[in-house]
């Protein structure tokens, strides 16, 4: 069958634990959700009302059908998409849907503030082309995000 709700790669670990009938350790915070109740018993709702991503320079949130991405490298930039109307993220609404942008920024700020600080500093900050395979040559004007490692 097909499960059409949004999930996150962090759900895999929790789902494996659930399939093995192993309780999640209380001493470790696990962000993922066990997907088995949603898949096997048709549990109502969805595993995540909101999804977050964060690294040192790039952060994103999906809430309801809106996605906000923001990056600080090489320059500060924001992207806002209505995923219901624009699933391929072609129309950046960041300068139009200001109330939604403000709400998602506040939610993302709160989430980022709740995260533990990195244990080790990043060693590399490399440019990655947006919507272009790494096998294609970089052209002046190509859109980039910077990915830390």
Region spans (language model):
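A generic structural signal for short coil/turn motifs at secondary-structure boundaries
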Residues: 1-2, 90-92
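Polar, surface-exposed loop/tail segments
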Residues: 1-61, 120-125
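Long, internal low-complexity/basic segments
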Residues: 12, 75-76, 83, 91-149
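Short beta-strand micro-motifs enriched in acidic
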Residues: 69-73
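Intrinsically disordered, low-complexity polar regions and short flexible loop motifs
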Residues: 86
């Amino acid at each position: 069958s097909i499960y059409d709700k949004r999930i996150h790669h962090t759900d895999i670990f929790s789902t494996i634990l659930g399939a093995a009938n192993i309780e999640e350790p209380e001493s470790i915070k696990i962000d993922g959700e066990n997907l088995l109740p949603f898949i096997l018993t048709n549990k109502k709702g969805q595993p995540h009302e909101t999804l977050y991503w964060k690294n040192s320079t790039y952060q994103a949130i999906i809430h309801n059908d809106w996605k906000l991405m923001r990056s600080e490298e090489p320059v500060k930039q924001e992207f806002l998409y209505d995923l219901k109307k624009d699933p391929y993220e072609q129309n950046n609404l960041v300068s139009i849907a200001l109330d939604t942008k403000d709400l998602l920024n506040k939610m993302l700020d709160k989430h980022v503030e709740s995260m533990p600080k990195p244990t080790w500093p990043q060693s590399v900050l490399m440019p990655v082309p947006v919507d272009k395979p790494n096998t294609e040559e970089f052209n002046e004007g190509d859109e980039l995000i910077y990915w830390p490692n």
